[in-house]
C-alpha cells in the first residue's frame, strides 16, 4: 500500500529459478539412460492409464543436462508428427529433437502408430501398430512434458511387466545423442 512506511517493498529470492529452468553443465551433448516405473490396473476399461510429467518427475532436467539445452528449448526443437512421419525420415535435422522408440534390437523407430507423437508397442517392446498383437502404447506431448502410457483394454495381462523405451534423439552438428527413458509398466 502507498501509505505503508516500508513501501516500496524490496524482496530478494535466492536458491530458486524459473520453473523448469536447469543449470546446464559445460561441454558437448551426451547420451542418457534413465528409468521410470508405474503400477497399472490390467482390468481398466480406459486406454490411457497414467501420465508422467517429465518436468516434475525430474526426467527433463536429466535430459536437459545431457543435451545441453533448457527443457523449453527441447520442447521447441521437438519435431511435429507430420515431419517425423514423412517418408524416408531417418532422424532429426541439426538442432532438432525427434521422439522415437528404442526397439529391443537397439534400433530407433520413428514409425508413429498412436495419436500424435507415440507408438503402439508389442509385448517384447518393439514398435507395432494398433490391433496387430500390440497391447500397450505411449504418447508424448512435448509442450506439456507429458508422457502418457496406456493399454488396449482386455489385452494387458495381470501380473505382467512390460518394458518400453521412449527415446528423444537430438542432432547436434550431425551427431545424434539419445535420451532413452526405460519405463516398466507393471500390471496388477
Where are these regions (language model features)?
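Extracellular/luminal low-complexity segments enriched in Ser/Thr/Pro
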Residues: 1, 140-160
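A short beta-strand micro-motif common to beta-rich folds, especially ectodomain repeats
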Residues: 1-2, 9, 158-172
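Short structured motifs
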Residues: 121, 131, 148-150
Amino acid at each position: 500500500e502507498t501509505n505503508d512506511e516500508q513501501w516500496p517493498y524490496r524482496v530478494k529470492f535466492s536458491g530458486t529459478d524459473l520453473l523448469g529452468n536447469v543449470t546446464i553443465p559445460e561441454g558437448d551433448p551426451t547420451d542418457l539412460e534413465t528409468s521410470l516405473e508405474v503400477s497399472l490396473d490390467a482390468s481398466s476399461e480406459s486406454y490411457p492409464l497414467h501420465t508422467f510429467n517429465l518436468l516434475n518427475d525430474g526426467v527433463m532436467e536429466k535430459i536437459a543436462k545431457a543435451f545441453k539445452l533448457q527443457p523449453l528449448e527441447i520442447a521447441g526443437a521437438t519435431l511435429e508428427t507430420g515431419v517425423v512421419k514423412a517418408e524416408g525420415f531417418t532422424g532429426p535435422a541439426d538442432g532438432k529433437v525427434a521422439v522415437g522408440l528404442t526397439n529391443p534390437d537397439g534400433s530407433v523407430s520413428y514409425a508413429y502408430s498412436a495419436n500424435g507423437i507415440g507408438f503402439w508397442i508389442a509385448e517384447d517392446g518393439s514398435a507395432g501398430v494398433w490391433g496387430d498383437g500390440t497391447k500397450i502404447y505411449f504418447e508424448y506431448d512435448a509442450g506439456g512434458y507429458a508422457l502418457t502410457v496406456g493399454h488396449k483394454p482386455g489385452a494387458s495381462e495381470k501380473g505382467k511387466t512390460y518394458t518400453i523405451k521412449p527415446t528423444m534423439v537430438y542432432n547436434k552438428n550431425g551427431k545424434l545423442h539419445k535420451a532413452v527413458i526405460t519405463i516398466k509398466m507393471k500390471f496388477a
